[in-house]
Swiss-Prot record:
The keyword Nucleotidyltransferase applies. Zn(2+) 1 binds at C70, C72, C85, C88. Residues 1391-1411 are annotated as: Disordered. NCBIfam families: rpoC_TIGR. This is DNA-directed RNA polymerase subunit beta'. The lineage of its organism: Bacteria, Pseudomonadati, Pseudomonadota, Betaproteobacteria, Burkholderiales. Pfam families: RNA_pol_Rpb1_1 (PF04997), RNA_pol_Rpb1_2 (PF00623), RNA_pol_Rpb1_3 (PF04983), RNA_pol_Rpb1_4 (PF05000), RNA_pol_Rpb1_5 (PF04998). InterPro entries: DNA-dir_RpoC_beta_prime, DNA-dir_RpoC_beta_prime_bact, RNA_pol_asu, RNA_pol_N, RNA_pol_Rpb1_1, RNA_pol_Rpb1_3, RNA_pol_Rpb1_3_sf, RNA_pol_Rpb1_4. It catalyses: RNA(n) + a ribonucleoside 5'-triphosphate = RNA(n+1) + diphosphate. Keywords: DNA-directed RNA polymerase, Magnesium, Metal-binding, Nucleotidyltransferase, Transcription, Transferase, Zinc. It comes from Verminephrobacter eiseniae (strain EF01-2). One of its GO terms (biological process) is DNA-templated transcription. Its cofactor is Mg(2+); Zn(2+). Binds 1 Mg(2+) ion per subunit. Binds 2 Zn(2+) ions per subunit.
């Protein structure tokens, strides 16, 4: 009986494994898998449709084609289970064994595995130390390889052609052995002595860098072979496994034809060629024929494994390349990405969505028909439980007939059973949320309007999918974690996601505006009820200014109880009525103003922080209901008269046209260049457009009214278009400008600006030419969008892949490290406040009050809104907080270092997949970023040219440590530092603002001077860069020769002449001469730099205009020459998506700047080949030198002292340099700031945390500098956690630990170099990853999320983390228990054995076994 029950038991996969290993199979292993050899290429008999014996579908090898029935029909039914039929040789069993039983083909000649040959770098080449070209020549029978030189002068592994071989045979006879084809390669592989080779290579890790690198790689492979017990000769196949037939099916189509898997074709070819070769070898055919057949067999095997990898791909009947085994697993439609990482699921449906304004936030409307289909199993079980149906079949009938009882049951089943709604593309975790279904008529799903922004849904035909969680656990998780009312914040920024938009905003805005002299102005009411009655009676209008007695509930500082306070408040009727829905604890002041979209968002945010989740959700729903109602009552509409065209427009356009004409004249006269004219014209029209739109907004936003005293006053306008834009409901000033102002300048498809603007607007209408110009932009926009979506999706995919295994795994890693945060200030403006940067982070050290040094925040406390308000009040301007980068958790992150979970508002939970959330937060807004790289041209260049800085606040002036200046003859202070900054401190000495000042600027303030806001701090010439002397003396020119190094330029208009430094074209002089000036003192000696014996030498760059004469006396701070900035090409600024990708891929920028390698003094050496030799000498006298191309802009000069990591050559910084010279914290700051700049430009808010998490993953590998007593090879890249574990073990054993340095990898590189080969293989370059993993015999510890999804287990995150931890703990306990029992048994047996037996022996076998 038991065996019968076993039969029906479901086959359960064993989920209790902790790692997966991949390796290479030996011929023995392949034979052991096999159930028989496939000898014939036939598949099935075309008449009987039965598989041919010994063929590719043979039932004897692979199993029966009908359940429990042999092929000839002798044995049928269950009773003969396991019998092997003597007639047809088929085992009687289930037919599904045809999915798992493999066969094999014995190859008549060995064949190399193409993956190990052609997947770069060639593994065969690495092991044999031969080039790929040579191995290929041997394998494909073009050359011989010496496998055993014997006593001859030949070298092993040497290659010889046919002719050479014949000659050598004549010379040496049979002394040596040389072979062709895979046999030769196999012999070579067999002859490798791995241990010996390893020893030899370990001793050989010296010499040239190339050789060391090569040896290190070879050593790694050989050590892997040794460790995993894989023999190198297995890379050459002798036995080919055959895939089970049901995995490469043959399906009869109607009309007697068959659809077949390409693999069958490929196998057929291999079998045909193999049998032919076997026959030839038996017949002892001539060598050349056998050789040709062997080559063909090798090619057939290659095509089967990876078609098209070498030579032309094998094609089928229809000229299409056949799909080989490798193609099955790689790419988007391969096994990994199509079937393992993403699957289609049952119990799901999709339909169009419509708006459900009456729903509560946690509800959605589900069409009855859909619900009936989705909840079928639940309905069936209910019908059976009620006894209405006895079998599933009967229940099915009942449901299909649709009797009333079925609908009643559906209502019952659906109660409190959440369903999940998903809108594609699911860019972040709010793209799938759970709702409680409400049954509705019709066929469209109803969606709550407030969740639209999270789904990015609208109702113009969008569709959504519904999924039903089946198990109780799944329902529970959907309800607690995914219910829409539990996800009210965006995980990217912590801002509310349930913010009203469009009509709701308009309604609330309209109701909270105030109107001068509205009906009922000045009335006083006893309470809001009275206001409501007056409003209903038509005695008072919503916008009328009135006074009401209101009761507010607020929490005092020290208690949690709500206390009422009542007061008379001056407000409007609309606001008073709206105050009724405020949750207790939210002050009325938040609604006592015109509610625009931003204000409503703040209102919800404050409500969430002050009143909690539940109150906020109820409040949001009430806001929604009121918004819709009020918008309907307001009846705002658009008429053409609302689009007011400003009367000043004609004048502005006329003036601009005059200016453009003037410029055209100047251009014709040759006073300005074509480029200048174009820039100026674009500039003029840009200004004109702005002026028109200013005039238009001024006119739209104000209107004149009579107040109740009969005076004419102006108030904010009630113009419909203005209200829509002002409230944030729809449209913006830029859009209104196109309707009622002027459309302005348009861009060509290549991004350059057309200089003829569109002066008309949409109200006046466009003429044909204007219309044509404007189509450019529209079309470019559409093309851009399509490209952008694909690129953005790919960036998200790379980000997810690099961070997928980062999970919060412990509470606190107890590190003392952190990062110092202060507000980001640029050009004197606070771009990101300290509050935004430290909110929700953990303090890494005590935060003290700046004045009385009291502890405001102790270590390890998370900074929430209240604490930050205290810090702001105390005026703290920098805080050291813990960050994801400094966290010391080995695998994953700790909760304290991560801080607040932005999507939930509290400290992050254990098991939260912070990596994936970071990737989603950065990738989701990707589609909003621009694709274009901006040219600084036209409209953009106006903002760039600055010529002075002003103080923004009152305070005391200070200079940064890098600031250096000299006083010139007029007593002005001239800056001679390249990176000097002016800092303004308030009276407590806290930094308020910081301004960069360029080289050569004149300072208009002194240190410690008190300044008022608006004071000019420094000014400079914007369009030229000066060369300044720091010392006094008389100039002495060197190499300044007219016609050779300088040219005299005459200014036509003014008649003045200047010397311009030119590039010496005459290559006659061996050394390149460089024009320079030295200074001579009164005695005629050269002026030396104080403290050195360098003389002061100031070089002139090409393009400099020399401002002094030879022999002129100059004072410090005087300008010797000026370099026009115009001469420098304006660099393209990479913006938007490409910039973000560039940063995360850690690419070295083109034209990168150079940072100083060490702290020291700058000097210039001899020039070579158009390059300048720049040297830095440190205090110990070590010299570092760098060759800099002439056209680069060098930021330092002779004798200047630079600090390590300071910029010495202009250009964008290379992240690798920043990491090497300045360390991890600086690098992180650089990447975070640069990425944030791109997003900030688009108005997207992302928390710094997310970017830090990605930088952490980019830094997760290190490079071994010195192996110490570990098994690493220097130069090897290792996972950081692994080397830390190794070093701990080494220290514990008293050995020398390995020394390593940080390594920054781009996200693609980092994903591919992860320890998990399953994750890497499913990302990109599947073949290469799997080849490498197989050779190394890699183990995948299944730590990440992706690996676990692929092997089909719960992921180790969220609720799954607890499951896995519990499972591992239980396994460990079971192990310990087992060990204890075994020990006890052994002890018992030993005790028995100690009793002397008859022959006097006392030791038994049990002792040996116990050991």
């Amino acid at each position: 009986m038991k065996s019968l029950l076993d039969l029906f038991k479901q086959f359960t996969p064993d989920e209790h494994f902790d790692a997966i290993r991949i390796g290479m199979a030996s011929p023995e292993k392949i034979r052991s898998w096999s159930f028989g050899e496939v000898k014939k290429p036939e598949t099935i008999n075309y008449r009987t449709f039965k598989p041919e014996r010994d063929g590719l579908f043979c039932a004897k090898i692979f199993g029966p084609i009908k359940d429990y029935e042999c092929l000839c029909g002798k044995y049928k039914r269950l009773k003969h289970r396991g019998v092997i039929c003597e007639k047809c040789g088929v085992e009687v069993t289930q037919t599904k064994v045809r999915r798992e039983r493999m066969g094999h083909i014995d190859l008549a000649a060995p064949c190399a595995h193409i993956w190990f040959l052609k997947s770069l770098p060639s593994r065969l080449g690495m092991v044999l130390d031969m080039t790929l070209r040579d191995i290929e020549r041997v394998l494909y029978f073009e050359a011989y390889v010496v496998t055993d030189p014997g006593m001859t002068a030949l070298k092993k592994l040497s290659i010889m052609s046919e002719e050479d071989y014949e000659a050598k045979r004549k010379e040496y006879g049979d002394e040596f052995i040389a072979k062709m084809g895979a046999e030769g390669i196999k012999d070579l592989l067999e002859s490798i002595d791995i241990d010996l080779s390893i020893e030899k290579l370990r001793g050989d890790l010296t010499g040239s860098e190339v050789k060391v690198k090569k040896n290190a790689k070879r050593l790694k492979v050989l050590e892997a072979f040794k460790k995993s017990g894989i023999k190198p000769e297995w890379m050459v196949l002798q036995v080919l496994p055959v895939l089970p037939p049901d995995l490469r099916p043959l399906v009869p189509l109607d009309g007697g034809r068959f659809a077949t898997s390409d693999l069958n074709d490929l196998y057929r070819r291999v079998i045909n060629r193999n049998s032919r070769l076997r026959r030839l070898l038996e017949l002892k055919a001539p060598e050349i024929i056998a050789r040709n057949e062997k080559r063909m067999l090798q090619e057939a095997v290659d095509s089967l494994l990876d078609n098209g990898r070498r030579g032309k791909a094998m094609t089928g009947a229809n000229k299409r390349a056949l799909k080989s085994l490798a193609d099955m697993i790689k790419g988007k439609s391969g096994r990994f990405r199509q079937n393992l990482l993403g699957k289609r699921v049952d119990y799901s449906g999709r339909s169009v969505i419509t708006v459900g304004p009456t729903l509560k936030l946690h509800q959605c409307g589900l069409p009855k028909l859909m619900a009936l289909e989705l909840f079928k199993p639940f309905i069936f079980s209910r019908l059976e439980a009620m006894g209405i149906a006895t079998t599933i079949k009967a229940a099915k009938k009942e449901v299909e007939s649709g009797t009333p009882v079925v609908w009643d049951i559906l209502e019952e089943v659906i109660k409190e059973h959440p369903v999940m709604l998903n809108r594609a593309p699911t860019l972040h975790r709010l793209g799938i949320q759970a709702f409680e279904p409400i049954l509705i008529e019709g066929k469209a799903i109803q969606l709550h309007p407030l969740v639209c922004s999270a789904f990015n849904a609208d109702f113009d035909g969008d569709q959504m999918a519904v999924h039903v969680p089946l198990s109780v656990e799944a329902q529970m998780e959907a309800r607690t974690l995914m219910l829409a009312s539990n996800n009210v914040l965006f995980p990217a920024s912590g801002e509310p996601s349930i913010v009203p938009s469009q009509d709701v905003v308009l309604g609330l805005y309209y109701a909270t505006r105030d109107r001068i002299n509205g009906k009922g102005e000045g009335l006083v009411f006893a309470d809001t009820g009275e206001v409501q009655r007056a409003f209903d009676a038509g005695e008072v209008e919503l916008a009328a200014r009135i006074t009401v007695r209101l009761t507010e509930w607020s929490k005092p500082k020290d208690s949690d109880a709500l206390v009422p306070t009542t007061a008379l408040v001056e407000t409007t009727a609309g606001r008073a009525l709206l105050s009724e829905i405020l949750p207790p604890g939210l002050p009325f002041s938040y609604v006592n103003k015109a509610l625009k979209k931003k204000e409503i968002s703040r209102l919800i945010n404050v409500s969430f922080r002050k009143c909690g989740l539940k109150a906020t959700v109820v409040f949001a729903d009430k806001l929604l209901q009121n918004g819709f109602r009020l918008a309907t009552r307001a009846g705002i509409s658009i008429a053409i008269d609302d689009m007011l065209v400003p009367p000043q427009k004609a004048g502005i356009i006329e003036r601009s046209e005059r200016e453009v004409k003037e410029f055209e004249q100047q251009y014709v006269s040759g006073l300005v260049t074509a480029g200048e004219r174009y820039n100026k014209v674009v500039d003029i029209w840009g200004k004109a457009g702005d002026e028109v739109s200013k005039a238009m907004m001024a006119q739209l936003s104000k209107e004149q009214v009579i107040d109740r005293h009969g005076q004419q006053v102006s108030q904010e306008s009630f113009n419909s278009i203005y209200m829509m834009a002002d409230s944030g409901a729809r449209g913006s000033a830029a859009q209104i400008r196109q309707v009622a102002g002027m459309r302005g300048l348009m861009a060509k498809p290549d991004g350059s600006i057309i200089e003829t603007p569109i002066t008309a607007n949409f109200r006046e209408g466009l003429n044909v030419l204007e219309y044509f110009i404007s189509t450019h932009g529209a079309r470019k926009g559409l093309a851009d969008t399509a490209l952008k979506t694909a690129n953005s999706g790919y960036l998200t995919r790379r980000l997810v892949d690099v961070t997928q295994d980062l999970v919060v795994t412990e509470e606190d890693c107890e590190t003392a490290n952190g990062s110092l945060m202060r507000a980001i200030v640029e050009g004197g403006e606070v771009i990101e406040s300290l509050r935004d940067r430290i909110l929700g982070r953990t303090a890494a050290e005590e935060v003290l009050h700046p004045e009385n040094r009291m502890v405001l925040v102790p270590v390890g406390v998370m900074l929430d809104e209240d604490l930050i308000e205290e810090l702001e009040a105390a005026g703290v301007d920098e805080v050291k907080v813990r960050t994801a980068l400094t966290c010391e958790t080995r695998y994953g992150l700790c909760a304290k270092c991560y801080g607040r979970d932005l999507g939930r508002g509290g400290l992050i939970n254990l098991g939260e997949a912070v990596g994936v959330i970071a990737a989603q937060s950065i990738g989701e807004p990707g589609t909003q970023l621009t694709m274009r790289t901006f040219h600084i041209g036209g409209a953009a260049s106006r903002a760039v040219i600055a010529s002075r800085v002003e103080a923004k606040s009152n305070g005391v002036i200070g200079f940064s440590s890098t600031m250096r200046y000299v006083s010139n003859t007029k007593g002005e202070l001239v800056v001679i530092a390249r990176s000097g900054e002016i800092v303004i401190h308030d009276e407590y000495g806290r930094e308020r603002e910081r301004h960069k000042v360029p080289y050569g600027a004149t300072l208009t303030v002194n240190a410690d001077q008190n300044v008022k806001a608006g004071t000019v701090l420094a000014k400079w010439e914007p369009l030229t860069r000066p060369i300044i002397t720091e010392f006094a003396g008389r100039t002495k020119f060197e190499n300044v020769e007219e016609g050779l190094t300088v040219a005299r330029q005459l200014d036509e208009v003014t008649g003045l002449s200047t010397l311009v430094v030119i590039d010496p074209k005459r290559r006659g002089a061996a050394k390149v001469v460089r024009p320079q000036v030295k200074l001579i003192d009164a005695q005629g000696n050269e002026v030396k730099i104080p403290g050195t014996d360098h003389s002061v030498t100031i070089g002139f760059q090409v393009g400099a205009l020399i401002q002094v004469r030879d022999g002129q006396d100059v004072g410090p701070g005087e300008v010797l020459a000026r370099i026009p900035v115009e001469g420098q090409k304006t660099r393209d600024i990479t913006g938007g998506l490409p910039r973000v990708a560039e940063l995360f891929e850690a690419r070295t920028p083109k034209d990168k700047g150079t940072l100083a390698e060490m702290t020291g003094t700058v000097s210039f050496g001899k020039e070579t080949k158009g390059k300048v030799r720049l040297q830095i000498t440190d205090p110990e006298g070590h010299v570092f030198e760098e060759l800099v191309p002439k056209e680069k802009n060098i930021l330092v000069h002779e004798g200047q002292v630079v600090n390590k990591g300071e910029s010495i050559v202009d250009g964008p910084a290379d992240p690798q340099d920043i990491l090497r010279l300045l360390g991890i914290e600086e690098l992180s700051r650089y990447i975070v700031d640069e990425v944030q700049d791109v997003y900030r430009l688009q108005g997207v808010k992302i928390n710094d945390k997310h970017i830090e998490v990605i930088v952490r993953q980019m830094l997760r590998r290190v490079v071994v500098e010195d192996a110490g007593e570990s098994n690493y090879i220097s130069g090897e890249q290792v996972e950081r956690s692994e080397i830390l574990n190794t070093n701990e073990a080494l220290r514990a054993a008293g050995k020398i630990p390995a020394v390593y340095s940080n390594l920054l990898l781009g996200i693609t590189k980092a994903s591919l170099s992860t320890d998990s080969f399953i994750s890497a293989a499913s990302f990109q370059e599947t073949t290469r990853v799997l080849t490498e993993a197989a050779i190394m015999g890699k183990r995948d510890e299944l730590r990440g999320l992706k690996e676990n999804v692929i092997v089909g287990r719960l992921i180790p995150a969220g609720t799954g983390l607890a499951y896995h931890q519990a499972r591992k703990a239980k396994d460990a306990m079971d192990d310990a228990e087992r060990r204890a029992i075994a020990d006890a048994e052994a002890a018992e047996m030993a005790a028995q054995a100690e009793v002397p037996e008859l022959d006097g022996s006392s030791v038994t076998a049990s002792d040996a076994a116990a050991d």
